[in-house]
Amino acid sequence: MKLIIVSGRSGSGKSVALRVLEDLGYYCVDNIPINLLPALTHTVINDYENVAVSLDVRNLPKDPEDIPEIIAYLPKAVDVNTLFLDADDNDLIRRFSETRRLHPLIKENMALDQAIALEKSLLEPISTNADLYINTSQLSPHQLADLVRERILGKKTGSMVLVFESFGFKHGIPVDADYVFDARFLPNPFWEKSLKGQTGVDQEVKDFLASQAIVTKFIWQINSFMMTWLPHLERNNRSYVTIAIGCTGGKHRSVYIAEMLAKNFRKERDDIQTHHRDIDIKST
């Protein structure tokens, strides 16, 4: 049986993730006390192949440090993966203000920002051991649903998933990136009048960048670096590795390089994904 534990700070998108898993055929249980998790798995192990449970701060044991020990009591036949959702503090505050929901930890004389900080501390034993961490600050509910679906389906083979993500430094570095490469020194199609409105997936931009020897060398060196160290990461039981490529706006150079790296690695591996975070953001 495959078990996915969905956790994260309040307002980060756990309900969206759980709905996606339900749509994918998972038997879903919302907000189960973690102390009951071993009993639940023993009950459903013969009836369901895929199970997902949502765990929030209200259902933790008295000592959150006991969480790894509780998970260790699960049947050995259960393949456990933890998905942890989070967002920047300012975005969580904004979401609570917009929805006018009450944070579950708010008590008398406790401000919202204090409750959010406390929740982060309480959930740290889960977040630090998560197999997949997603920061939802820059994701709409629809984008989050697509990303969760992509990552879950990408794990069918059980091998490590390699994600090549493009982004723009002007919009911030992806929080979930394991490796970050800066492509801002490369020739920029943005300054070519005919290419400015296109992106790194358009043929004219690809032709422009492919003609630059320095771009080809940059891609080759990243490719060689990752090929060298991926076997060591896999032996460390990593589920995902995200390689983020950044340029100024996240539309041309980083997109092209991420696509080329993914193309190269697909010759050797099956679980390759691409994510172009900022490709649809309008230029300012």
Swiss-Prot record:
Binding site for GTP: D56, V57, R58, N59
SUPFAM superfamilies associated with the record: P-loop containing nucleoside triphosphate hydrolases
Cited Pfam families: PapZ_C, RapZ-like_N
Residues binding ATP, per UniProt: G8, R9, S10, G11, S12, G13, K14, S15
Keywords: ATP-binding, GTP-binding, Nucleotide-binding
InterPro entries: P-loop_NTPase, RapZ-like, RapZ-like_N, RapZ_C
GO MF, one example: GTP binding
Record family assignment: Belongs to the RapZ-like family.
Biological function: Displays ATPase and GTPase activities.
Cited HAMAP family: RapZ_like
The protein's name in its UniProt record: Nucleotide-binding protein CPS_4546
Source organism of this protein record: Colwellia psychrerythraea (strain 34H / ATCC BAA-681) (Vibrio psychroerythus)
